[in-house]
Amino acid sequence: MKRIAVLTSGGDAPGMNAAIRAVVRKAISEGIEVYGINHGYAGMVAGDIFPLTSASVGDKIGRGGTFLYSARYPEFAQVEGQLAGIEQLKKFGIEGVVVIGGDGSYHGAMRLTEHGFPAVGLPGTIDNDIVGTDFTIGFDTAVSTVVDALDKIRDTSSSHNRTFVVEVMGRNAGDIALNAGIAAGADDICIPEKEFKFENVVNNINKGYEKGKNHHIIVLAEGVMTGEEFATKLKEAGYKGDLRVSVLGHIQRGGSPTARDRVLASRMGARAVELLRDGIGGVAVGIRNEELVESPILGTAEEGALFSLTTEGGIKVNNPHKAGLELYRLNSALNNLNLN
């Protein structure tokens, strides 16, 4: 394989630029030319494709977002869109593609491979909801961003004896809420993977204040419901204290990636090039127990999010990823909670 391309698709995530940089520089070291595709699959179909050099990715490793831009392009789910994209790739003499994104992006990569065009997927999403990897590119940075915000919210919450509901991203997965909540010492963490009763949340809040606490922080994963809906249900369940809602929103996607995300993205990007160099497509690169692994992109894209296959201790956990179950139990123990 003498010429490959790289694109980013779906929601942006810190560390995508680091992954692109690794793809470009590793490929050049292997004697492979690299082309960038702007705006994901939309740019592929439109022919928005251009050569990348080592200088093109200089000083990009510490930048958030993606300099190749990103977009959602539902038309690529249709065969016509897929074939149009492949036709453009062939015009540029491209023989393989590295796709950086979430599960929607993986479906596109899977379709390319089914049409005989090798594609390798890299998990780029803050949600950490990709099967086949313990961690996704951007997750660590997003958690750090949320922890910083929670620390600040605690300051103002304590000053006014307030209860805060802090809504965080994650789509249908509670990984951001769970990890950031524990790291910030949140009082309650509510995630889609674990059922809870609002009456018990109210009891936890009231008990905290009775013991002398001057604030209460609830971290809410967006996959449960919106922060405003949650606040309304808390009041319906009997909570009468001062209650505010903070929605962190897209700030969680931005910012300079952490060292962990930069290293993870660099390792994955380099591995993707090695796979394409060897003529291997239709796989996604992941990390398990700090070791890089590959899994069929078909299974990765079709299996769905974490915590989806089995039920253990009331939490749906997608084996072998057990971090969610362990962390949820840890939070309950540290805060002596009973949300069930």
Swiss-Prot record:
Allosterically activated by ADP and other diphosphonucleosides, and allosterically inhibited by phosphoenolpyruvate. InterPro entries: ATP_PFK, ATP_PFK_prok-type, PFKA_ATP_prok, Phosphofructokinase_CS, Phosphofructokinase_dom, PKF_sf. It comes from the Bacteria. SUPFAM superfamilies: Phosphofructokinase. One of its GO terms (cellular component) is 6-phosphofructokinase complex. The active site is at 127 (proton acceptor). GO terms for molecular function: 6-phosphofructokinase activity; AMP binding; ATP binding; fructose-6-phosphate binding; identical protein binding; metal ion binding; monosaccharide binding. Keywords: Allosteric enzyme, ATP-binding, Cytoplasm, Glycolysis, Kinase, Magnesium, Metal-binding, Nucleotide-binding, Transferase. It is an enzyme of class 2 (transferase). Its cofactor is Mg(2+). ADP binds at residues 21-25, 154, 185-187, 211, 213-215. Pathway: Carbohydrate degradation; glycolysis; D-glyceraldehyde 3-phosphate and glycerone phosphate from D-glucose: step 3/4. The keyword Nucleotide-binding applies. Gene3D superfamilies: 3.40.50.450, Phosphofructokinase domain. It is found in: Cytoplasm. ATP binds at residues 11, 72-73, 102-105. Its main location: cytoplasm. Its EC number is 2.7.1.11. Mg(2+) binds at residue 103. Substrate binds at residues 125-127, 162, 169-171, 222, 244, 250-253. Homotetramer. Catalyzes the phosphorylation of D-fructose 6-phosphate to fructose 1,6-bisphosphate by ATP, the first committing step of glycolysis. This is ATP-dependent 6-phosphofructokinase. It comes from Lactococcus lactis subsp. lactis (strain IL1403) (Streptococcus lactis). The gene is pfkA.
